[in-house]
Every structure is written in C-alpha cells, then in structure tokens.
C-alpha cells in the first residue's frame, strides 16, 4: 500500500535538497510551492481573482502576477494576506490532491512537500510527517547568505513561522541537517532504510 509522507521544515533548513534526494530514491513529490505558482499562473481563474482583490497593478505587462507588488502588500497588511490565502489555498489543495491521487493510483509512494504544513494544520492529511531540521542560527546564517538579507530581516523571516524546535517535537521523524550535504544524504538513507523504503544491501 503506497504511503503519503508530509515533508516540511523551516526557511533555509534544506527541505528542497531533501525533496530532490527523495525524487532520486524513486518517490513522487507533490510540491506546494509549485502548486501555488500554478494556482495564479497566466490565464487562470486564480489570477483573475488576484486582479479583482489587488487591482490591475498586481498584474505585470506580461499578464502574470507581480509577486513583488503583491508580496509587499500582504507583508504589511495581514487582512490582505488572508484574502490572498482565501484565493490561493483552495486551488492549491485541488491541484495537489489531483497530483497525489494520480501517483497513488500508479502505486508510487508520495511526498507532499509543504513548507507551512504545521502552520496550516495539514498533518492529518498525510500518513506521517518528516521534518528537515537545522538550528535557528544556521537557518539565519543560510538565509542571509542565500537571499542577501540583513541579520534583522533574516531573523524576522525565521521567527514568522512556528519555531523549528517546536516543529521537530510535532513531527513523526526528524531528518538532521546540521552538517553538510553528504551527511544529510546519509541521514536520509538511514531513515529510508529503517522505514523499509530502501534496502542498503541492494
């Protein structure tokens, strides 16, 4: 019986790397971020709803959502963030559910890659939750380097989510990413072996 695993983490914990590794191990990944982009892609009903809620300035000359413009609005106006979520989330759920069912019907184990899994209380939609863990100090350091952010901005982004330590206590399994990529791969392989997804002797 194929399994549905919820994969989550925090900003800059290395979840995308784990997602890529799991694909290499034969899992099918359904990515919430990709689904969110599809939900408001050019020519979609979702994009028209964004235009109605945020005005013509929310759409670029190319007919796509102006992410920077909308991002600044929702960052500064919590009620607008809720409005955007009300537009995007139902469409995202529909897209992800369709992809998940398609893979399950083909007999694949499915990874639901959902950054805000706990924040949106989606743990009951999967068989178990795997969390990619690193320390908050490493999160902040990686974020500053990756996104060219100041210390204050990096901290603000990290602290806008449930803390990674609290999430680790809520998850079924924690994938340690305190070291380098090779150590991360070894930690993931160990989990997959323990869970019976792969046979190391093979």
UniProtKB/Swiss-Prot annotation:
A single BP term in Gene Ontology: coenzyme A biosynthetic process
Signal peptide positions on this chain: none
Keyword Cell inner membrane: no
Any Pfam family hit: CoaE
Keyword terms of this UniProt record: ATP-binding, Coenzyme A biosynthesis, Cytoplasm, Kinase, Nucleotide-binding, Transferase
Record's subcellular location: Cytoplasm
Binding site for ATP: 12-17
UniProt function note: Catalyzes the phosphorylation of the 3'-hydroxyl group of dephosphocoenzyme A to form coenzyme A.
Name of protein: Dephospho-CoA kinase
